[in-house]
């Protein structure tokens, strides 16, 4: 394995030559020295969509996305600087003033670290308002929470499922994730694998069961436990993470580092857990 030496925040480190700056920094993180990311997925090729992970590289005129920029010999990287903090603050404020980030993990911490104030652009998010789309029994689409990170598009497309059901439609402020000709999900080629839900960072895509429990005020994530198991529907042996609340399975995910699934599941593995409930 060929390695590369570079300097990150004044400290020299050696990593594999194919590593990205984000990987060289230990991956996404929170706190004062963590690199924030919204559009990064461990098993999806980076799109550089959110621009939240930008860092400063000596000799580069512009800030570079840490999630996709590959390390180079003797590269000097600053993960925190006046330019970096300003850029991240602006991204957080732009997103926070136009998108509902209430369910986005870590965003409150990042807002505090970078002193971002989305309210200075107005108290109410100036987003494209539309009702939550509930056109099937398995998952809902709330585009008021969508940041156009492309992860669902890539998970549905060539990188994971190869169904190619959704893509980005429209332009500018009207850009949105859409099925072909914006047909209802049941009329599309969707196979309801739910892999788009797995990668969504903001809660724009959510299982119906979770959506209903949140609406009823009965979704208590802090009270949930997780159980690792193997899917019993077929012989592939997909790894499942069962989210359990009040002795009932309320959600199923799959770990991205699983050597078989890499986070992917089919409709049976992700949504077919009702048979296991004690009813």
Give each language-model segment a name:
Residues 4, 10-73, 86-87:
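N-terminal cofactor/phosphate-binding cores enriched in small/glycine residues
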Residues 9-11, 141-142:
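Extended, non-catalytic structural segments that build the interaction scaffolds
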Residues 34-36, 205-214, 243, 249-251:
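Acidic/polar loop patches that form or flank catalytic/metal-binding clefts of enzymes
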Residues 51-54, 60-192, 197-198, 203-230:
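Fe-S ferredoxin-like electron-transfer domains
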Residues 122, 243-279:
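Cofactor-/ligand-binding subdomain signature composed of acidic, glycine-rich
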Residues 223-255:
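Catalytic and ligand-binding motifs that coordinate phosphates/metal ions
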């Amino acid at each position: 394995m060929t390695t590369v030496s570079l300097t990150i925040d004044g400290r020299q480190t050696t990593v594999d030559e194919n590593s990205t700056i984000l990987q060289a920094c230990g991956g996404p993180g929170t706190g004062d020295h963590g690199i924030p990311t919204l559009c990064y997925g461990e098993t999806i090729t980076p799109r550089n969509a959110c621009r939240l992970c930008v860092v400063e590289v000596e000799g580069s005129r512009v800030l570079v996305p840490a999630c996709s920029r590959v390390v180079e010999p003797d590269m000097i990287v600053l993960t925190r600087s006046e330019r970096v903090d300003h850029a991240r603050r602006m991204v957080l404020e732009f997103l926070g003033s136009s998108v509902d980030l209430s369910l986005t993990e870590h965003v409150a911490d990042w807002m505090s670290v970078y002193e971002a104030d989305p309210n200075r652009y107005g108290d109410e998010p100036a987003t494209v308002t539309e009702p939550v789309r509930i056109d099937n029994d398995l998952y809902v689409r709330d585009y008021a929470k969508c940041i156009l990170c492309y992860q669902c598009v890539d998970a549905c497309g060539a990188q994971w499922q190869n169904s190619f059901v959704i893509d980005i439609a429209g332009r500018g402020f009207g850009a949105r994730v859409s099925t072909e000709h914006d047909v209802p999900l049941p009329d599309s080629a969707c196979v309801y694998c739910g892999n788009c839900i797995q990668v969504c960072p903001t809660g724009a895509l959510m299982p119906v069961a979770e959506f209903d429990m949140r609406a009823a005020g009965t979704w208590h994530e802090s009270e949930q436990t997780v159980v690792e198991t193997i899917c019993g529907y077929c012989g592939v042996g997909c790894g499942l993470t069962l989210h359990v609340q009040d002795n009932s399975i309320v959600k199923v995910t799959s770990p991205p580092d699983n050597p078989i699934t890499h986070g992917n599941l089919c409709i049976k593995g992700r949504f077919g857990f009702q048979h296991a409930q004690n009813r």
